[in-house]
Amino acid sequence: RSSAASDVYKRQDYMVTTKKRLSAFYPTDLELLLRNLGIRRVVLTGCMTDCCVINTAFDAANRDFRVVVPRDLTRGSEHLEEPALRMISLHLGLVVDSEALLGEWRSQKE
């Protein structure tokens, strides 16, 4: 794990939900959970950028969540990872480096 991922996992206020299909939103209670917690932005990480991450990004954007994908905390097929990240950046949300995202979070705490 990168140091950025380690920083995120140190937090005690995160929840884990089990993904059953290509999107974390289907068929789960994730949307209900996020809405009940008042969460409007989702940060997506994981493997299969060109499949599961992008499917979850589409579903999140279609449900009016703001999508952020840390490019260094995802992995995909060799030839499809970068095109998937470009598609997310063009149509679905923000693609950033995890250190920049953590820096933004830290500055919001101050």
Per-segment meaning from a language model:
Residues 61-62, 89:
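Anion (oxyanion) recognition and catalysis
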Residues 43-47, 66-78:
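A short glycine-rich beta-strand->turn/loop micro-motif centered on a GG-aromatic cluster
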Residues 40, 66, 94:
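Residue-level detector of anion-binding/catalytic polar loops
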Residues 1-5, 9:
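Single conserved hydrophobic/aromatic residue that forms the stacking wall/gate
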Residues 76-91:
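Active-site-proximal loop->helix
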Residues 18-43:
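Alpha-helical scaffold elements lining the catalytic groove of polysaccharide deacetylases
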Residues 50-56:
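Short glycine/serine/threonine-rich phosphate/pyrophosphate-binding segments
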